[in-house]
């Protein structure tokens, strides 16, 4: 009987996944998020312990104080840096920062919560309201625009971590309090999400925002950002989803839970959807953790040891005046004249993945903008906006990643005015694009071979002469003809040539031009090859 039940459960899980969980209008999804974000303050929220919650190398209980382990007689001292970080995030979201907020005790007993309560802001949160705007243009959602409202933001302390070790006789619980008392911001959204794309876009945008503001690493994988989902269908009760370690888990859990509830509703088995419940994600399905009947009474009460947070209007306005330009505004500027970047390239300069040691988005954007200005001065009205984009974002970054040279180091030999001179050589066709790639890689490779110690600014003229990289202005007609014929001779497939000549596959011409450029080592320009190939093959289109 037990085996039969397991078989049925497994079959049902596979069936739900096979449906792909499409969202149907008759089963309207209503979804909201609760996001806990660890703040990367220097110290913890109520003690002088170093804040190193996401470090993977620290010994257990290394970053702890008497207060963090709840030694009797110790008292909390509020870290004002956490208040500043919370204010920056609130202002970036357009939230109303409350002039008075307070900390409350949330009582529960657990091994990794030594105080027996958590300090949070239940009655008077730090900020209310606000929103994040999503758009089809920037966020790849289906609607032209979608506003996700924010209910509130509150500051609270994180808990410790429990680690379980199995022995021959028992299971031992080990407690690490390095994370205990690390400052968190809990953000609660309104239930404004109606599909998966919106959820994914919101998480990515919020993640980038906290990184942009330098208040958190925003990493889901290390627990610096943790997301719970509140989900309901039509007017049925809310289900909370927990244990969601990354974006794919969040998306898959929503898909699974949506389809699970749709199946229950469609067969009339809605008794389990009448009361709120909490469910966990196992990696393939959601399982019930607790229902309303087992909901914990946290017995909230104002903390008697901490005074109110009282913020004067000039403090809030002062922080507002120090706020950086926000990512969406930056992207829209970059996508317009004079830069005219694609969305993909604009995101490279605006979104910080937090995973690239060679550069961060702010340093890269600053380098790009400075180089663009210098190049525009040199080239004047004839400047080509695509040159800085293609050569910095694609060629230059590609070389840095390949050679593992940090941008900060590369800037020492190729500062923006020097890189602008390099772009001018390409713009004036002193060297071809192929020669430019060879020259740029040689400069960076030589710098790498010196262990980034040779800070000599490259002399482009000498290097061009040394490697004979000058573009050929007077092309030898016979040499060009021979090169083109050699390239064509390599393609014995008549279909390839026929599709090219008839225009059925015009992209093949670019392939032939690329082959010719390689054979000439970039000395002969692409347009010369294009004209000669069209002449030889009698291409009329």
Swiss-Prot record:
Keywords: ATP-binding, Ligase, Mitochondrion, Nucleotide-binding, Protein biosynthesis
UniProt-recorded Gene Ontology molecular function terms: ATP binding; glutaminyl-tRNA synthase (glutamine-hydrolyzing) activity
GO cellular component assignments: glutamyl-tRNA(Gln) amidotransferase complex; mitochondrion
Signal peptide annotation: none
Locations listed in the record: Mitochondrion
GO biological process: glutaminyl-tRNAGln biosynthesis via transamidation; mitochondrial translation
Pfam families hit by this protein: GatB_N (PF02934), GatB_Yqey (PF02637)
Catalysed conversion reaction: L-glutamyl-tRNA(Gln) + L-glutamine + ATP + H2O = L-glutaminyl-tRNA(Gln) + L-glutamate + ADP + phosphate + H(+)
EC number: 6.3.5.-
Gene3D superfamilies, A to Z: 1.10.10.410
Alphabetical list of NCBIfam families matching this protein: gatB (TIGR00133), PRK05477.1-2 (NF004012)
Function: Allows the formation of correctly charged Gln-tRNA(Gln) through the transamidation of misacylated Glu-tRNA(Gln) in the mitochondria. The reaction takes place in the presence of glutamine and ATP through an activated gamma-phospho-Glu-tRNA(Gln).
Subunit description: Subunit of the heterotrimeric GatFAB amidotransferase (AdT) complex, composed of A, B and F subunits.
Additional remark text: This protein may be expected to contain an N-terminal transit peptide but none has been predicted.
Family: Belongs to the GatB/GatE family. GatB subfamily.
Protein name as it appears in the record: Glutamyl-tRNA(Gln) amidotransferase subunit B, mitochondrial
Record gene name: PET112
């Amino acid at each position: 009987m037990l085996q039969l039940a397991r078989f049925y459960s497994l079959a049902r899980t596979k069936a739900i996944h096979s449906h792909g969980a499409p969202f149907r209008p008759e089963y309207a999804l209503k979804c909201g998020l609760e996001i806990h974000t660890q703040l990367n303050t220097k110290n913890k929220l109520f003690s002088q312990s170093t804040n190193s919650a996401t470090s993977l190398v620290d010994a257990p209980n290394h970053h702890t104080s008497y207060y963090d382990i709840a030694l009797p007689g110790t008292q909390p001292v509020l870290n004002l840096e956490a208040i500043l970080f919370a204010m920056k995030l609130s202002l970036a979201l357009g939230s109303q920062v409350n002039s008075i907020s307070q900390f409350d005790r949330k009582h529960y007993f657990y091994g990794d919560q030594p105080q027996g309560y958590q300090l949070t802001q239940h009655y008077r949160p730090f900020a209310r309201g606000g929103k994040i705007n999503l758009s089809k243009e920037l966020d790849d959602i289906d609607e032209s625009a979608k506003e996700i409202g924010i209910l509130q933001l509150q500051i609270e302390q994180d808990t410790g971590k429990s680690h379980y070790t199995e022995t021959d006789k028992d299971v031992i619980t080990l407690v690490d309090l390095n994370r205990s008392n690390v400052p968190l911001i809990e953000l609660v959204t309104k239930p404004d999400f109606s599909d998966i794309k919106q959820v994914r876009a919101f998480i990515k945008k919020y993640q980038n925002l906290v990184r942009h503001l330098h208040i958190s690493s925003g990493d889901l994988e290390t627990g610096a950002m943790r997301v719970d989902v509140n989900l309901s269908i039509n007017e049925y009760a809310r289900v909370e989803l927990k244990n969601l370690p990354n974006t794919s888990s969040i998306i898959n859990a929503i898909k699974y839970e949506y389809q699970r509830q749709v199946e229950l509703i469609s067969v009339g088995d809605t008794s389990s959807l009448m009361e709120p419940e909490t469910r966990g994600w196992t990696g393939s399905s959601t399982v019930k953790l607790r229902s309303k009947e087992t909901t914990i009474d946290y017995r909230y009460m104002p903390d008697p040891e901490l005074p109110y947070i009282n913020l004067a209007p000039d403090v809030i306005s002062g922080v507002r005046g120090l706020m950086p330009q926000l990512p969406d505004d930056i992207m829209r500027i970059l996508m317009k004249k004079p830069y005219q970047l694609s969305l993909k390239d604009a995101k490279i300069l605006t979104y910080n993945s937090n995973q690239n040691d060679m550069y961060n988005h702010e340093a890269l954007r600053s380098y790009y903008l400075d180089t663009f200005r210098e190049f525009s001065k040199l080239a004047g009205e004839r400047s080509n906006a695509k040159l800085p984009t293609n050569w910095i974002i694609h060629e230059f970054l590609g070389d840095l990643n390949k050679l593992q040279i940090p941008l900060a180091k590369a800037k020492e030999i190729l500062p923006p005015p020097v890189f602008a001179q390099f772009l001018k050589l390409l713009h004036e066709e002193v060297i071809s694009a192929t020669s430019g790639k060879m020259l740029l890689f040689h400069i960076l490779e030589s710098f790498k071979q010196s262990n980034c110690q040779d800070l000599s600014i490259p002399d482009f003229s000498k290097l061009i002469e040394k490697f004979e990289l000058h573009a050929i202005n007077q092309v030898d007609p016979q040499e060009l003809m021979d090169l083109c014929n050699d390239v064509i001779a390599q393609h014995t497939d008549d279909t390839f040539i026929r599709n090219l000549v008839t225009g059925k596959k015009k992209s093949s011409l670019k392939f032939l031009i690329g082959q010719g450029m390689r054979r000439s080592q970039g000395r002969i320009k692409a347009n010369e090859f294009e004209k000669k190939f069209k002449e030889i093959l009698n291409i009329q289109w």
